[in-house]
């Protein structure tokens, strides 16, 4: 089927390319609902088809066939004249699929250079890889073409060979990302430092005003196991970034133009972290209540994972909030060409 030659003008439209599960909230299922709440039209292409995420202990399904992913992307990006405002890429299990995605997105960007490509280089967490190692070189080739990346601390280590134990390590990691890949926006979604137990940090930079401007958020760590948070972060970031950008475009007073403000990205990240805090509190509260009612669930991997699924629908009001409960700290930047 081919759509008429219509450009879908007037809607915010994103193509989300990541994992697909029938049950629960990871991958496309975690990113789609928040984006739709923010009035985005979301088209999805799966990279895997699973019954549920791997934390359940047992799952059915398989990785998609590269040719299938290519056909889907070709139909959406080339054949049907659909114009996307953004492309969101997440979990990709192997090199063959990630190469297909890279080729298709790069070809689309040549014809649509203004499309925002938000790349989450999903490779692993806490020292453990959960994709084929041969994706690393392709991710490194992709990053310079993206608008922004959202790695976790372990993924920064893979991309830079810098292990993050301190805030200075995180800054050095971001500086090396900037030097190696030249990307204009990067966020380490969360990391811990040895001297601050119970606290998580999020650090990023944006080149909105030319040189990279660094920002840092810190927020309390919640006990518990949460899955799909990285996918939620990237989906929300796209929504909040566009919202903040549109708001500033409509503020035309001379005073607004002359006022030096935090970058759009820094403001968006603060809103994302605030939204996610509410989602995780709601998720933890629900799981604790379920375990209190039936303590036997704690010994059943499937039921426990089910109780810990993100409470996205129940947090829909919070997901739309434009407030930030956290205050950004703005750090001295780094200069291009410095040794790391």
UniProtKB/Swiss-Prot annotation:
Ligand binding (substrate): 19, 130, 231
GO BP annotation list: pyridoxal 5'-phosphate salvage
This enzyme's EC code(s): 2.7.1.35
Catalytic activity: pyridoxal + ATP = pyridoxal 5'-phosphate + ADP + H(+)
Cofactor dependency: a divalent metal cation
Top-level enzyme category: transferase
Residues annotated to bind ATP: 189-190, 218-230
Family matches, as CDD domains: pyridoxal_pyridoxamine_kinase
InterPro entries: PM/HMP-P_kinase-1, PyrdxlKinase, Ribokinase-like
Keyword Repeat applies: no
GO CC entries: cytosol; nucleus
GO molecular function, one term: pyridoxal kinase activity
Keywords, alphabetical: ATP-binding, Cytoplasm, Kinase, Metal-binding, Nucleotide-binding, Nucleus, Transferase, Zinc
Subcellular compartments: Cytoplasm; Nucleus
Signal peptide coordinates: none
Family: Belongs to the pyridoxine kinase family.
Function: Required for synthesis of pyridoxal-5-phosphate from vitamin B6.
Stated name of the protein: Putative pyridoxal kinase C18.10
Species of origin: Schizosaccharomyces pombe (strain 972 / ATCC 24843) (Fission yeast)
Source organism phylogeny: Eukaryota, Fungi, Dikarya, Ascomycota, Taphrinomycotina
């Amino acid at each position: 089927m081919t759509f008429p030659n219509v450009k879908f003008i007037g809607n915010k439209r994103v193509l989300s390319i990541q994992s697909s599960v029938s049950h629960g909230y990871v991958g496309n299922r975690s990113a789609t609902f928040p984006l739709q709440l923010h009035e985005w039209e979301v088209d999805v292409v799966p990279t895997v088809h699973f019954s549920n995420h791997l934390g359940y202990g047992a799952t059915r399904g398989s990785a998609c066939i590269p040719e299938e992913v290519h056909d889907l992307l070709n139909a959406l990006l080339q054949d049907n004249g659909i114009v996307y405002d953004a492309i969101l890429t997440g979990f990709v299990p192997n090199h063959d699929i990630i190469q297909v995605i890279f080729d298709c997105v790069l070809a689309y960007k040549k014809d649509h250079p203004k499309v925002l490509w938000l790349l989450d280089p999903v490779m692993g967490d806490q020292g453990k890889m959960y994709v084929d190692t041969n994706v690393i070189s392709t991710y490194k080739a992709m990053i310079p073409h993206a608008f922004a990346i959202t790695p976790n601390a372990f993924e920064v280590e893979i991309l830079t060979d810098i292990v993050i134990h301190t805030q200075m390590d995180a800054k050095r990691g971001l500086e090396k990302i900037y030097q190696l890949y030249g990307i204009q926006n990067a966020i380490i979604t969360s990391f811990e430092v040895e001297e601050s137990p119970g606290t998580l940090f999020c650090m990023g930079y944006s080149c909105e005003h030319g040189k990279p401007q660094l920002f840092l958020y810190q927020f309390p760590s919640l006990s518990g196991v949460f899955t799909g948070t990285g996918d939620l972060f990237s989906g929300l970031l796209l929504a909040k970034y566009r919202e903040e950008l549109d708001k500033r475009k409509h503020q035309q007073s001379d005073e607004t133009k002359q006022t030096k403000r935090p970058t759009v990205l820094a403001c968006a990240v603060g809103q994302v972290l605030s939204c996610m805090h509410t989602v995780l509190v709601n998720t933890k509260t629900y799981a604790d209540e379920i375990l209190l009612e039936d303590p036997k669930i704690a010994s059943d991997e499937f039921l426990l994972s089910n109780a810990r699924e993100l409470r996205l629908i129940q947090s829909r009001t919070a997901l739309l909030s434009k407030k930030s409960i956290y205050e950004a700290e703005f750090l001295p930047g780094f200069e291009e060409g410095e040794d790391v």
